[in-house]
Swiss-Prot record:
Organism annotation: Methanosarcina mazei (strain ATCC BAA-159 / DSM 3647 / Goe1 / Go1 / JCM 11833 / OCM 88)
CC annotations in GO: phenylalanine-tRNA ligase complex
Pfam families, sorted: B3_4, B5, tRNA_synthFbeta
Record flagged with keyword NADP: no
Name the UniProt record assigns to this protein: Phenylalanine--tRNA ligase beta subunit
Family: Belongs to the phenylalanyl-tRNA synthetase beta subunit family. Type 2 subfamily.
Amino acid sequence: MPVITLHYEDLEKLTGTDKETIIKRVPMIGADIERVEDEYVDIEFFPDRPDLYSVEGAARAMRGFLDLETGLPEYEIKPYKVSISVSEDILKIRPFLGCAVVRGVKFTSSSIKSLMDLQEDLHWGLGRNRKKVSIGVHDLKNVKPPFRYMAVDPGFEFVPLDYTEKMSMTEILEKHPKGTRFAHLVSGFEKYPIILDADDNVLSFPPIINGTLTSVTEETTDLFIDVTGLGEAVYTALNIVVTALAERGGEIEFVRVIRPGGEELVLPDLEPEERLLTTGEVKSLIGMELPVEEIVKQLERMRFGACALDKETVEVRVPAYRADILHNYDLVEDIAKGYGYENIKVKIPETYTAGMSHPISLMRAPVNEIMVGLGYYEVMPFTLTSEKVNFENMCREKTDDVTYVLHPISEDQTMLRTTVLPNLLEILALNQHRELPQKIFEFGEVVSNETTGQHVAAVSIHPQANFTEVYEVVDAFMREMMLSYEVKESKDPAFLEGRRADVYVNGKKLGVFGELQPEVISKFSLGYAVVGFELDLNDLIGKNI
């Protein structure tokens, strides 16, 4: 989860109260205090609230929670003066584009850092490390509209941010620190995305690097913001950035986006989403019957627009920067936060039952202890995944035991995983900026034929990772679990031929281990050797071993 540094001077000015009150109350909106220093506080906000990833967003939420300013924030948007056209050839590379202009911003070194931190935290929280969303922030004074979002040849040259000489896009991907880190996001394409002004000056090479011409300084007052990506999350990210800048006094201005075929979008779209919420829904989730007036009050404290239609129904307007409101349950959660969990009455169950540890928990304890003892860190990725990750990236054939999501909201979460290893490789891909070796494991759920099972899987990445290393780990794990086993030659296509083996217990295949083959490593954009194993422990749960 992102840790946001909030400087007291900025925080008190934007919130309108003292730091002691803020530090005392901010955990109640969904945050953990990490560190309290003389000049600043580090706060870890939950990943479902990217609108809190900045001092401006946190202050906006706290003003409501402290009853200093309640209800739906209103942002005036000026008519557009800037337009940008989208070319046909970019649609197969990075098809979604959101843009806005914000004028009259007064920057200091700390507010620039806050904006850049928000940008990077959104890249992580909404953007899947820039894959789904990448954000460019530009000084508008050095470029000339209208702008163009298009694809160009890899030999196209410009001066990238923090450099003084021109480089081709190919050279940027090979030599620039940002280029080498994010080159995999544009690999496989014959052309690369670019945003140009009317005089062919470069604003951005998304999702890699901006041009140096539009770098933001303390003298910058007017900004052009571009957000590119693979889906509609770009519009949410845009709304979060522009409303944060508006909280600091900036004036938002529409941008006209002209798409191929003449379709036009006028962005940002800050119109709130409207929902209907009933008192019955609230009672069913928090266990208390709150009057409609109390529900309206608490929703307004949490910065929603709310109006009672009758004694049982509330019309709720959801701010356009709230990425986490997917269901009415999310509204009820915010009502509970506003009302105060400490104020929700405890109800003692009328019947007595004796509790005991679940068999899965009894299995989890020794598994975790063994893997941690072997030097691995536990991770907990999502059970939802996609066919691409679960099968294609692993070079495995699609199976017919898959449970699919009926109406997925993301192409990354269309099915329940049938194996754990791909999720671990995704985590390695997201942590390439950290030092090696990296060793991670998970004891978690998989679903096959609508039946839930428990697997343990682990991966290790570093230049010297080999079959011997993973064999020793599997052997140690099986011995510590007091399981007699044998290994046989494996034909699992995810692993390198001759460096893979299946694990059998009592004649039944339990799992597989070995060196991941180069094609798998490449598909997850990993640059070093990876070894791993996965074992099905379902038949062992509840048994004495």
